[in-house]
């Protein structure tokens, strides 16, 4: 007989594990709505080129790619930002700016499965399109920080930030092609600094610039005053990147005033190739990987054929975030089992269940043909707190019996008093 199991790198989530995911989703959704964001749901399947165009080397190598019956090259989405950008061009380009969108969905990457890395996983994220101001960047970071604050993680996390515009501007100034820029940044992201510097040396042929690159790439934890000092260096002015350092200084100073924990890492690069300015990741001391990340991508929408539109966003790794939460208590409704003692009680069983479900109780109707002496301990062992028992005598008097399955306290009351009776027994 054939035995089917989950595909490698993918996982079933059942009961409390599924509820934890939905709980995180509800926290994120409520917060995003309070910040003025509207939900967007995009397809899991998109054209391969949508992601391949600016996804970066690593992403392209891990995509699930296939051809459909019309010979179109398609992909399961490895992330959601490009889908939102495509949907914006297709549906929202003429709408008033900025556009604020949030999403929650599964993504797929053919990575080697390991702790904190899956081939199917969930992302919760936002995108703000049509605003290039520092206020937009701060709003996005504030929302991200507040999400983790609601999970009681704000004292543990730190947001690592950098401005990838520093690297971009230098390479643009010396006419390094986009594909080569992408490769250099990929090497830096993988901590292959020497390889990246070798390529830069071959293309720039300028030792001073290579030395400057090396200098900033090794500044892993830069203080605010260091950024201000760097902005005043002669070589920074010569390379026309003073504004990029001053932006980082302004942003960092305001983040400090907002009591958001962060660190500046001038050697930090993210793997996705579309970032143009601010980049950031959320780190937690209990794991070796980031649990969320994002940045500014001011050229992606134009690259996709839309009008020039600055944009910024982030994605939260849902499963990764759950890994760092020690005690996530999901509030559950009271579990109620409704037991009828004869066929005549069936209509009353359903009527009682309807009443209780309207009041947010979790209600199950008993379908087992067993004596009450076996049913009550069984349902108590399954986590039910209350049993509603409807027998022949109760039915004749329009009464029900409410029993606390933990304390075994029970009372008989008229049907209309069922809610008060449950509260009395709990």
UniProtKB/Swiss-Prot annotation:
Cellular component terms (Gene Ontology): cytoplasm
Keyword Ligase among UniProt keywords: yes
Keyword Mitochondrion assigned: no
Enzyme class per UniProt: ligase
Alphabetized PROSITE patterns for the sequence: AA_TRNA_LIGASE_II
Chemical reaction(s) catalysed: tRNA(His) + L-histidine + ATP = L-histidyl-tRNA(His) + AMP + diphosphate + H(+)
Keyword terms of this UniProt record: Aminoacyl-tRNA synthetase, ATP-binding, Cytoplasm, Ligase, Nucleotide-binding, Protein biosynthesis
GO MF assignments: ATP binding; histidine-tRNA ligase activity
EC id: 6.1.1.21
InterPro entries registered for this protein in UniProt: aa-tRNA-synth_II (IPR006195), aa-tRNA-synth_II/BPL/LPL (IPR045864), Anticodon-bd (IPR004154), Anticodon-bd_dom_sf (IPR036621), His-tRNA-ligase (IPR015807), HisRS-like_core (IPR041715), HisRS/HisZ (IPR004516), HisZ (IPR004517)
SUPFAM superfamilies: Class II aaRS ABD-related, Class II aaRS and biotin synthetases
NCBIfam families in alphabetical order: hisS
PANTHER family per UniProt: HISTIDINE--TRNA LIGASE, MITOCHONDRIAL-RELATED, HISTIDYL-TRNA SYNTHETASE
Name of protein: Histidine--tRNA ligase
Organism annotation: Saccharolobus islandicus (strain M.16.27)
Organism taxonomic ancestry: Archaea, Thermoproteota, Thermoprotei, Sulfolobales, Sulfolobaceae
Protein's gene: hisS
């Amino acid at each position: 007989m054939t035995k089917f199991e989950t595909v490698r790198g993918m996982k079933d989530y059942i009961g409390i594990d599924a509820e934890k995911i939905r709980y995180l989703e509800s926290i994120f959704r409520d917060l995003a709505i309070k910040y003025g964001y509207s939900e967007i749901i995009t397809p899991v399947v998109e054209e391969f080129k949508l992601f391949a165009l600016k996804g970066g080397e690593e992403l392209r190598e891990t995509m699930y790619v296939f051809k459909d019956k019309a010979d179109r090259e398609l992909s399961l989405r490895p992330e959601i930002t490009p889908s939102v950008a495509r949907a914006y061009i297709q549906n929202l380009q003429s709408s008033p700016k900025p556009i604020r969108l949030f999403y929650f969905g599964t993504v797929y990457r053919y990575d080697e499965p390991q702790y904190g890395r899956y081939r199917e996983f969930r992302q919760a994220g936002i995108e703000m399109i049509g605003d290039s101001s520092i206020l937009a960047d701060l709003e996005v970071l504030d929302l991200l920080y507040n999400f983790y604050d609601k999970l009681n993680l704000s004292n543990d996390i730190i947001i690592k930030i950098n401005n990838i515009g520093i690297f971009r501007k230098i390479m643009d100034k010396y006419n390094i092609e986009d594909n080569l820029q992408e490769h250099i940044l990929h090497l830096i992201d993988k901590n292959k600094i020497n390889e990246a510097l070798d390529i830069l040396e071959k293309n720039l042929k300028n030792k001073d610039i290579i030395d400057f690159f090396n200098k900033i790439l090794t500044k892993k934890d830069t203080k605010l005053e260091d950024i201000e000092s760097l902005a005043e260096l002669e070589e920074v002015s010569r390379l026309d990147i003073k504004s990029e350092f001053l932006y980082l200084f302004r942003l960092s100073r305001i983040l400090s005033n907002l009591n958001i924990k962060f660190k500046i890492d001038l050697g930090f690069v993210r793997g996705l190739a579309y970032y143009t300015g601010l980049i950031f990741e959320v780190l937690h001391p209990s794991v070796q990987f980031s649990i969320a990340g994002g940045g500014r991508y001011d050229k992606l929408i134009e690259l996709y054929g839309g009008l020039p539109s600055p944009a910024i966003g982030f994605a939260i790794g849902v499963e990764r975030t759950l890994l760092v939460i020690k005690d996530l208590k999901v509030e559950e409704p009271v579990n109620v089992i409704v037991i009828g003692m004869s066929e005549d009680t069936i209509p009353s069983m359903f009527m009682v269940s309807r009443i209780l479900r309207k009041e947010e109780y979790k209600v199950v109707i008993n379908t087992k043909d067993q004596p009450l002496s076996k049913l009550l301990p069984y349902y108590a062992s399954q986590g039910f707190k209350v049993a509603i028992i409807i027998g022949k005598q109760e039915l004749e008097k329009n009464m029900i019996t409410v029993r606390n399955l933990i304390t075994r306290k029970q009372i008989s009351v008229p049907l209309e008093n069922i809610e008060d009776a449950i509260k009395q027994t709990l």
